Amino acid sequence: MNSYALDLADVLVEAGAIRFGEFRLSSGSTSPIYIDMRIVPSKPQLFRRVLGMLAEKLNDVREVDVVVGVATAGIIWATGLALLSEKPLAYVRPKRKEHGLQRVVEGIVEGRRVLVVDDVATTGSSLASAVESLREAGAEPVAAMVIVDREQGAVERLADYGVKLYSLATLREIIHAMVVKGYLDPAEATRLINLLYGESL
């Protein structure tokens, strides 16, 4: 079993960052489960714990020069990862500013290999948009990293751009880890997996 998934199960439960019900995602689809990574930085010890996992996972990624956060949720994770890895930081806005220098990409990225960071990947549309903006700014996006991959097309979408997506765990792995840890009843986990992916645990 993915050790990151086991650790994340503890973090998500302790932080109150995993919720069950009916939620509309940024992709427009609905989901019976929601991962709210935005709340984790409010718990410094848990925040540090997840950042440590990301820093360790960075060892799997080919050499990168700059860590780039996707606004807004990805910026705080990219900032922590940049500090731990002692790499420069930049970030990508969802749209161009209408004042000041009117930039989409903030930070020095031209001619540099960059890692794009976000909290959760669903379809990968936000990450793909960031990759496009970074290329327009003269950067070379070589990889992307998220804490949780919901397995709804992000890996494939980024592969179309020649960018590999790394994640600490998939949502499926986290659900399984929650069963192993005793946080979730196996029958409920099977129901969730069936709703999400049309299959059993």
From Swiss-Prot:
Pathway given in the UniProt record: Pyrimidine metabolism; UMP biosynthesis via de novo pathway; UMP from orotate: step 1/2
Coiled-coil annotated residue ranges, if any: none
EC main group: transferase
Cofactor requirement: Mg(2+)
Catalytic reaction list: orotidine 5'-phosphate + diphosphate = orotate + 5-phospho-alpha-D-ribose 1-diphosphate
Superkingdom of source: Archaea
Positions that bind orotate: 122, 150
Biological processes, Gene Ontology terms: 'de novo' UMP biosynthetic process; pyrimidine nucleobase biosynthetic process
GO MF, one example: orotate phosphoribosyltransferase activity
Keywords linked to the UniProt accession: Glycosyltransferase, Magnesium, Pyrimidine biosynthesis, Transferase
EC number, UniProt record: 2.4.2.10
Record has Transferase as a keyword: yes
Residues reported to bind 5-phospho-alpha-D-ribose 1-diphosphate: 93, 97, 99, 118-126
Record's keyword annotation contains Magnesium: yes
UniProt record similarity statement: Belongs to the purine/pyrimidine phosphoribosyltransferase family. PyrE subfamily.
Function: Catalyzes the transfer of a ribosyl phosphate group from 5-phosphoribose 1-diphosphate to orotate, leading to the formation of orotidine monophosphate (OMP).
Assembly and oligomerization: Homodimer.
Protein name (database record): Orotate phosphoribosyltransferase
Annotated source species: Hyperthermus butylicus (strain DSM 5456 / JCM 9403 / PLM1-5)
